[in-house]
């Protein structure tokens, strides 16, 4: 009922500001019950006792009813009466609450559009397709038959006012646009909002839902141009790839594309006609692969750059798009170095008394976890040195022994599960070695002992049961399928279809 009420209000007037004065908006933002299709971490609308406080929400709404304080906050960002002192608790608390509620409201038209599109097409919801690892089987199936790959980054930097203009299509009331600019004024010392994934991560620490929505709306507009070119250049629609893109919420984007095709534009689209082009994106990085010639992929690059520059009114760096031939190129995507390998294979063909040797080539998508980048991430998190030597974690020494073990085991399990698709398993062994010894050093430091003395006292089986759980489960899986011993199991690549979010240590690129 609440969802229908919000949707009707938004469709009738497209006014956002009145919804900010409703208490249930902030409850939805906190309890993460607005839409199960959107993966956000719960918002911290808490008081001093670390519990959800409806009283604080009511106080905030009462202050928002006082238009004088809100107007003065928009006109004078230096003396902000609404947020209070910028270093105070009330300032951060009020800013976070309003921005997260604002993000919930802005998701209404996009979420309702996605749900209606799914219902109209009657496409089943597959939980497996929401996994990040589901991209790699797709690449294994498609990239082996393609010739060129274009490794591109979503254009940035972008001026903050362009984001306001993008949302102006959905938001009609002026106070909401002023409130949006007010949030941007909090970060006036930054030149751009979307500069890198690190910047987005910094923003998401305080306002996860709001800034991730802004980032997704900007990427929406960037992909709008690509989908427009793709739809106009070829009228063939791929059902398999359409179902695959369910995880990235592209149904609403594909369904509501504006069909604008002028006569002068048809000549350009004819040169871009390619029925074997595939597009995959995660966050700010995308892969554009084609079976066509080098000239065709260069035309795609040329027109994408020009359309982006004309649409967003800023210069797009062409060097951010790298075009390479697939058999001779290794591209970085989702924490892996991927490349197409050609393996020569000799097949003996026996026909009656004659035998023939046939030389053939087999292609295979090889994925390798970059050990240098992973060690660099572990070094930044203070688990090891730059050279990969394990060190203790002093900040965790105030925790209990069980909590320290849980922290290390969780990080080790997440990293090893995510990089289980690597063909080089030595990287996983290196990760386990670093985290295991770092855990032992941390516990020894807490108990003011040496690692050797601590390990001798607890026995050689210390930590083994925590780190071998994954290997035991994998052994059971493979023993059910192959009747012979696990020869070459260390080379098997495994993709998990339940990973919906990249760990901070994994997102090292």
Curated annotation (Swiss-Prot):
Pfam families to which the protein is assigned, alphabetical: Intron_maturas2, MatK_N
Answer whether the UniProt record assigns the keyword tRNA processing to this protein. Answer: yes
Keywords from the UniProt entry: Chloroplast, mRNA processing, Plastid, RNA-binding, tRNA processing
GO molecular function terms listed in the Swiss-Prot or TrEMBL record: RNA binding
- Localisation per UniProt entry: Plastid, Chloroplast
The record's section on InterPro entries has: Domain_X, Maturase_MatK, Maturase_MatK_N
Per the record, its GO cellular-component terms are: chloroplast
GO biological processes = mRNA processing; tRNA processing
Which domain of life does the UniProt lineage start with? Eukaryota
Q: Which family does it belong to?
A: Belongs to the intron maturase 2 family. MatK subfamily.
Query: Any idea what job this protein has?
Result: Usually encoded in the trnK tRNA gene intron. Probably assists in splicing its own and other chloroplast group II introns.
This protein's name: Maturase K
Record organism: Arpophyllum giganteum
